[in-house]
Structure formats: C-alpha cells, structure tokens
C-alpha cells in the first residue's frame, strides 16, 4: 500500500508542479492534501469511531483552506485553476 501511495504522490507532483521536482508550490501542496483527505475520508466511512484520524482530517482540511486562501491572495487565476482541476468548491 505504501508503494501505491508513493506512486500517487509522484504523479500528483509531476502533474501540478510548476517545474520538475517542485514540491513546495501551493498547487502541489493543495493537491497532495486533497488526495490525503480523500483517502482519510474513505477510512473514516469504514471506521467511524476513529477520533484520532478524524482530528488529523480536520487539521488537513484547515491547512488546505489556509493554502487556498494564500493562493487566492497571490494569484486568482491559479486559484481558480486549482479549484477546477481538483473539483473543489469554494
């Protein structure tokens, strides 16, 4: 399972990165957090009493929200592009 997650992570970085090996841009960070949030949401559907994971999910959602707010303030066109690419609503 860890190998599959690593492959997904590499694909996300190559797709959303501004250059090769770009892991720090807001787009990459938002896309990686979105993937982790989706996986954790699936986990919580099966394990509804896993409160430690639920707290981690809430922290990730808050971090993604702050990154989206930062990106909106820096460049609105990049913000709108990442929302449409990831299927997020704001």
From Swiss-Prot:
One of the primary rRNA binding proteins, it binds directly to 16S rRNA where it helps nucleate assembly of the platform of the 30S subunit by binding and bridging several RNA helices of the 16S rRNA. Forms an intersubunit bridge (bridge B4) with the 23S rRNA of the 50S subunit in the ribosome. Keywords: Ribonucleoprotein, Ribosomal protein, RNA-binding, rRNA-binding. One of its GO terms (cellular component) is cytosolic small ribosomal subunit. One of its GO terms (molecular function) is structural constituent of ribosome. Belongs to the universal ribosomal protein uS15 family. It holds the Pfam family Ribosomal_S15. Part of the 30S ribosomal subunit. Forms a bridge to the 50S subunit in the 70S ribosome, contacting the 23S rRNA. NCBIfam families: S15_bact. One of its GO terms (biological process) is translation. This is Small ribosomal subunit protein uS15.
């Amino acid at each position: 399972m860890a190998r599959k997650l690593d492959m997904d992570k590499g694909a996300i970085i190559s797709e959303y990165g501004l250059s090769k090996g770009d892991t720090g841009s807001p787009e990459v960070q938002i896309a990686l957090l979105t993937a982790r949030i989706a996986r954790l949401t699936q986990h919580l559907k099966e394990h509804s009493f896993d409160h430690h994971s639920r707290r981690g999910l809430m922290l990730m959602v808050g971090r993604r929200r702050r990154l989206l707010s930062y990106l909106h303030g820096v460049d609105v066109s990049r913000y709108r592009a990442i929302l449409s690419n990831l299927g997020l609503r704001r």
